Amino acid sequence: MDVRQSIHSDHAKTLDTAGLRREFLIETIFVADEYTMTYSHIDRIIVGGVMPVNRTVSVGSEVGKQLGVSYFLERRELGVINIGGPGLITVDGTRYEMNSRDGLYVGKGAKEVVFESADAANPARFYYNCAPAHTTFPTKRVTPADVSPVHLGEDVTSNRRTINKYFIPDVLETCQLSMGLTELAPGNLWNTMPCHTHERRMEVYFYFGLEENSCVFHMMGQPQETRHIVVQNEQAVISPSWSIHSGVGTRAYTFIWGMVGENQVFDDMDHVAVKDLR
């Protein structure tokens, strides 16, 4: 488990490139036949990926001491979105088929969660966010047909995109976790511009669908103290509440956003005008 401490905005603005990447960038999400796990002190989110190829993969009791529990989801809820080939997730004996772009919400208290791929030649790639939970909501699969799509932006500003809201109150109940998938239209490069912050939630962006020799310049920092991190395919960036989170790619891409915090009101954000950025 990779543990990331919280960081004050005054400290963050003094960091060089290596320091910013060390504090906020998660470089490796998928490892064959393993799970990855990054624990952030910011709202206690856990971020990672599971890529079963030749065997099933599950999170066992090895995380118990670090999380202070007997099993992974004893006091946590889990959101998963598959960005790879067909797979299966078994939750306490119940099997859920997971095609590409399918999501699965797993409620607090699930004792055994097992991940597997249907085809080793085209393995599933399960990206997940995990947050503390105070009660149990039912485990539920969410398909692309179930999500609440919102179309934003336009070609002239290079930000035409579709926001697919997977785990939000309109789709299913969770304690605090919200997740969704945003896909840029071909030829569009910007996400979340004009940008915003949200004081009551943190957020993680996971970028994927980037072709070789492509990247995203992820913008972060306070609106008047912006910085950037160069992000490659299948990497994630942790965004504290005080930070903007936006990006521009060398070509179109897709990203999964995940938020945890004190509310789930999607529009509870503080907008920042482009003219006010520094």
Swiss-Prot record:
EC number: 5.3.1.17
Pfam family membership, one: KduI
Gene Ontology molecular function, alphabetical: 4-deoxy-L-threo-5-hexosulose-uronate ketol-isomerase activity; zinc ion binding
Cofactors that this protein relies on: Zn(2+)
GO BP field: D-galacturonate catabolic process; D-glucuronate catabolic process; pectin catabolic process
Pathway, per record: Glycan metabolism; pectin degradation; 2-dehydro-3-deoxy-D-gluconate from pectin: step 4/5
Catalyzed reactions per annotation: 5-dehydro-4-deoxy-D-glucuronate = 3-deoxy-D-glycero-2,5-hexodiulosonate
Source domain of life: Bacteria
Annotated function: Catalyzes the isomerization of 5-dehydro-4-deoxy-D-glucuronate to 3-deoxy-D-glycero-2,5-hexodiulosonate.
Protein family: Belongs to the KduI family.
Protein name, entry field: 4-deoxy-L-threo-5-hexosulose-uronate ketol-isomerase
